[in-house]
């Protein structure tokens, strides 16, 4: 029975993806206001919060290279200790331009701090940016905490951004985000929650801006229909809650120039999601660039696609964060 059930579930997901039936779209009205018992699930709840508080601690040096020094860091986020790393460029006079790199999904219990993110972070540091990577709540080395609609991850990023803005060696008007896969989802949410704090954003193979579409993909494609939603809302009963948690319904709030990259052969996150997000941002009159690649979900380091991704990202950050 299980294989048949899984096949049926995948068929339903395919039909929903192709037809758009039952999915919240940018042109749909946002659902009526309702209570958010978590205080962190809905875009409106996240926008009403304050961010920051505490200090970024450089725990120890992880690596010395000719171009940058890498530090293990930790910082507070809603009472949680979050681990990460910071690449401080050499040969660049502060105050620094900053890029925060948000990683995609890896089993939180086994997330290795360095391998996933260093190819992007190191290239950005060599280009003269101070680069910071948070590992998020619940991941190896960080405290666990609530995370409905993955909003906890966005809170961790925005608390970090608020702390970075207070650093004397950082330009508070030159902070960018670079998000891959799930980190792209985290980034999109940050753009509608604190648009005034983010001055350029790069999305690479990003998960969607629609919480319902994301749940459908995770539940049916990866979890075989057994995905347990983290939070008090039911995907079956609380569709209005999913609408209120979806950045796609708040794109009018975006103030940040956005650059989007996606591989045409991506079998993890639908290529169409990035194309559709580009269209939606353009419909709202936002500044957006979109690049398609003959590549899969993660571009191999040193490949033509990876090299173009990093060249375009660095040029984009240079243009919008200054030299």
Predicted regions and their residues:
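Hydrolase active-site cap/lid region
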Residues: 188-238, 302
């Amino acid at each position: 029975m299980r294989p048949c059930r899984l096949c049926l579930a995948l068929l339903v997901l395919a039909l929903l993806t192709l037809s758009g039936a039952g999915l919240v779209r940018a042109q749909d009205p946002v659902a009526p206001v309702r209570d958010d018992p978590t205080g962190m699930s809905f875009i409106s709840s996240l926008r009403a919060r304050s961010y920051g508080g505490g200090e970024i601690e450089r725990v120890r040096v992880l690596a010395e290279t000719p171009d940058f020094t890498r530090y293990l860091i930790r910082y507070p986020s809603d009472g949680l200790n979050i681990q990460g790393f910071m690449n401080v460029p050499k040969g660049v006079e502060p105050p620094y331009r900053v890029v925060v790199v948000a990683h995609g999904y890896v089993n939180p219990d086994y997330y290795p701090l360095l391998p996933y993110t260093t190819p992007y972070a190191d290239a950005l540091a060599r280009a003269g940016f101070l680069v910071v990577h948070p590992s998020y709540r619940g991941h190896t080395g960080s405290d666990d905490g609530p995370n409905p609609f993955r909003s906890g991850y966005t809170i961790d990023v925005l608390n970090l951004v608020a702390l970075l803005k207070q650093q004397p060696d950082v330009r508070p008007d030159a902070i960018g985000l670079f998000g891959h896969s799930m980190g792209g989802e985290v980034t999109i949410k940050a753009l509608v929650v604190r648009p005034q704090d983010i001055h350029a954003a790069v999305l690479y193979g990003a998960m969607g801006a629609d919480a319902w579409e994301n749940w459908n993909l995770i539940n049916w494609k990866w979890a075989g229909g057994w995905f347990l939603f983290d939070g008090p809302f039911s995907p079956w009963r609380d569709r209005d809650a999913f609408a209120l948690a979806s950045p796609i319904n708040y794109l009018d709030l975006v103030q940040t120039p956005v650059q989007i990259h996606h591989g045409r052969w991506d079998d993890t996150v639908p290529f169409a999601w990035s194309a559709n997000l580009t269209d939606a941002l353009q419909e709202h009159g936002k500044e957006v660039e979109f690049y398609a690649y003959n590549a899969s979900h993660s571009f191999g380091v040193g490949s033509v696609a990876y090299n173009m991704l990093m060249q375009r990202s660095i040029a984009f950050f240079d243009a919008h964060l200054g030299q």
